[in-house]
């Protein structure tokens, strides 16, 4: 949550007092106006009252403004996530022409050389109580997922009908990456992105399907406590690979970061 700024804090009693001052000024104006002898005196009275009300309102607005700012998101997020977001290029004319998911080679590389595809590495990293197939294989047979997207606990059991309960999500979706600049990459960089564990999470299968290729402008985790981390990771991925954001996407990210202004980028 954003830290409160004492300099911008205000007191309802002070506001009520200022409002009463305006009301009293209005009553004095009405009485003086009735008792005024001529047009010139009435004009002078009007100018004085307008000046008094203007000064009072001027003193009142700064006290109210912080709450308005919090409601509209005018205060500034200052963590590394927000700072990095400001550096990303905005492109409101992305093209998904030529998009091919297979071009990213997901699950076809073994970058760490442990003999396991990246899906198994992500499951082993993100699940707890992990059991491996045959006790020795790198294939995860079962485990428990504390799902970041829904906040639910999911039991993973490998099987034709059960494996899909836990899926591996590209936090920045492959299609979104393609539209954001990946369409210019060579084969090696596409494979690097498609299998980068920094951009991969084990998550609830239905939530992953619901998200599809949506950016933060169109989809956020239902688990509100994870949204700051989710957006920060998307920003980190886009910064790492020089990808762009749309203006609507950027605004959605900033809206989330206003609830956690000191949010840092994930390191791994």
Describe these PLM feature segments:
Residues 11-14, 21, 73, 77-80, ...:
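Non-membrane alpha-helical secondary structure
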Residues 27-49:
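N-terminal Sec-pathway targeting helices
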Residues 69-148, 152-153, 159:
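Cell wall/extracellular polymer interaction/catalysis modules
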């Amino acid at each position: 949550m954003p830290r409160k700024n004492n300099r911008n804090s205000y007191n309802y009693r002070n506001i009520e007092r200022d409002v009463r001052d305006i009301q009293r000024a209005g009553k004095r104006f009405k009485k003086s106006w009735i008792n005024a002898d001529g047009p010139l005196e009435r004009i002078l009275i009007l100018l004085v009252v307008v000046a008094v009300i203007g000064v009072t309102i001027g003193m009142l607005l700064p006290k109210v403004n912080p709450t308005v700012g919090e409601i509209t998101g005018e205060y500034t997020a200052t963590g590394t996530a927000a700072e990095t977001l400001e550096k990303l290029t905005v492109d409101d004319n992305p093209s998904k022409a030529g998009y091919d998911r297979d071009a990213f080679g997901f699950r076809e590389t073994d970058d760490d050389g442990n003999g396991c595809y990246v899906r198994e590495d992500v499951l082993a990293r993100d699940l707890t109580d992990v059991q491996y197939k045959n006790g020795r294989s790198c294939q995860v047979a079962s485990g428990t997922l504390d799902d970041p997207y829904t906040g639910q606990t999911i039991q993973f059991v490998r099987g034709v009908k059960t494996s899909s309960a836990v899926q591996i999500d590209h936090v920045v979706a492959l299609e979104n990456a393609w539209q954001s600049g990946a369409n210019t990459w060579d084969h090696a960089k596409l494979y690097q992105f498609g299998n980068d564990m920094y951009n991969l999470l084990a998550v609830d299968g239905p939530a992953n399907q619901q998200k599809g290729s949506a950016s933060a402008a169109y989809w956020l985790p239902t688990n509100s406590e994870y949204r700051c981390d989710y957006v920060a990771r998307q920003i980190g991925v886009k910064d790492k690979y020089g990808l762009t954001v749309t203006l609507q996407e950027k605004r959605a990210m900033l809206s989330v970061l206003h609830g956690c202004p000191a949010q840092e980028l994930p390191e791994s």
